[in-house]
């Protein structure tokens, strides 16, 4: 349901039609409102859509919540998605990393590049986030103005053990604040302290 993945789903559907299938990995790190948004965006595009159950919390290195957390998250999540796709006869899984991601610290990207069955076409052709937003606008995709998003585990300070309870606390807090604020809302979990970030 993000800017890049929605654009990629729309592009895949334009090229492949009903041969394309959008997958959304559902886990404790994925907020409920994003699940609903994924469904509505798939309906808007016209692409078939399936939720696939995954759990990054199965990985102890992910739960430790170090600076390489995203590496273990992507590894766990995409291993499940690749297995699901292969079992149903799909040759490739494509995901929405873009050219700008090469400029940032992205340990998750490293894990994707280690997977033979995962491709990142937006990155491979050099599309930037701004270009993706512009084309999304031209295609009438509402996500062209959507703020950047990250999974709930990114709200927990490094070193703070990731648990279902802490993820649920963040999701509930953001849900309440979102009733009063437009745009991006993030509640940073620092154990006994929460730091709220909203757009001005």
List each model region and its residues:
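ATP-dependent adenylation/nucleotidyltransferase module used to activate substrates
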Residues: 1-138, 194
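AMP-forming adenylation/ATP pyrophosphatase catalytic core
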Residues: 76, 109-200
